[in-house]
């Protein structure tokens, strides 16, 4: 197993730029576009969570398939807008335990790890916040982890407002020790890894119907639309983060989630946002 197969990531546009002048020009255009998007109102950034993607859900009689070890979620190809059909039948055994007394009455927020809260690399990062040793085929490799700006404030506030669950398509041997270092406050009530995803058409999908929580009270925060193709109406999408230390997206999200925590269900507020 090679190093990158441990971590599920999107491609850094800067790496595309380094490969070729043509790719670099396209990457630069993407970077400019992303910076413009960050400058918009935080409310407008949520509109994309209701875009329909040209990706089919598994048939109703199709059992959940455990994913093989491949490198990363592929990007979704935008085509004709079609309705995404949710995954039909929930499993007999849910991924999460019963809600604790501490979290009773709170909504459940599923939070992604890579490029949402942190960026990790097998290449040395001079200003890495953590260096995590990971064993691959009998050899110890160092993973350099950079924290997204304001991740500490974001996690602490989210832990006060919601039942928080870490759900990553990366392997536990990498993600678990990173979560130990990142979550100093015990915000995550549970941690779900690649084996808890559904492998569907080359992507690791986080099927929210398998959590054991009422879907109207579940939100997923993720940088990859492929991760929530079964439940796009539950998603609060974020921009992929790599190394921009001026990024404020997590900080900007806090007031939105403070309002969402007071709603009866997640759909009402998200629908109101899209109708503006």
Curated annotation (Swiss-Prot):
GO terms for cellular component: nucleus. One of its GO terms (biological process) is negative regulation of G1/S transition of mitotic cell cycle. The record marks 168, 206 as: Transition state stabilizer. Residues 1-31 are annotated as: Disordered. Binds 1 Mg(2+) ion per monomer. It catalyses: O-phospho-L-seryl-[protein] + H2O = L-seryl-[protein] + phosphate; O-phospho-L-threonyl-[protein] + H2O = L-threonyl-[protein] + phosphate. Mg(2+) binds at residues 112, 114, 223. This is CTD small phosphatase-like protein. It comes from Mus musculus (Mouse). The lineage of its organism: Eukaryota, Metazoa, Chordata, Craniata, Vertebrata.
């Amino acid at each position: 197993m090679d190093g990158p197969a441990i971590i599920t990531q999107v491609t850094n546009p800067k790496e595309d730029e380094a490969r070729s002048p043509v790719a670099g020009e396209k990457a630069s255009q993407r970077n400019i576009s992303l910076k413009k998007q960050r400058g918009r109102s935080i409310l407008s950034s949520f509109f994309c969570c209701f875009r329909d993607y040209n990706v089919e859900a598994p048939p109703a009689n199709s059992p959940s398939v455990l994913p093989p070890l491949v490198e990363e979620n592929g990007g979704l190809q935008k085509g004709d807008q079609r309705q995404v059909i949710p995954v039909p039948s929930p499993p007999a055994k849910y991924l999460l335990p019963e809600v604790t007394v501490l979290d009773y009455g709170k909504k459940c927020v599923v939070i992604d790890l890579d490029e949402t809260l942190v960026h990790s690399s097998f290449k040395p990062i001079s200003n890495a916040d953590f260096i995590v040793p990971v064993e691959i085929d009998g050899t110890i490799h160092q993973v350099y982890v950079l924290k997204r700006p304001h991740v500490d404030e974001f996690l602490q506030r989210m832990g006060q407002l919601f039942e928080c669950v870490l759900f990553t398509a990366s392997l536990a041997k990498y993600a678990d020790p990173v979560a130990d270092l990142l979550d100093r406050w015990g915000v995550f009530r549970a941690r779900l890894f690649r084996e808890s995803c559904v492998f569907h058409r080359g992507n690791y999908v986080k099927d929210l119907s398998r959590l054991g929580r009422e879907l109207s009270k579940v939100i997923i925060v993720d940088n990859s639309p492929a991760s929530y193709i079964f439940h796009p109406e539950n998603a609060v999408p974020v921009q992929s983060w790599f190394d921009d230390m001026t990024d404020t997206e997590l900080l900007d999200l806090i007031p939105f989630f403070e309002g969402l925590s007071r709603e009866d269900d997640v759909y009402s507020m998200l629908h109101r946002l899209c109708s503006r």
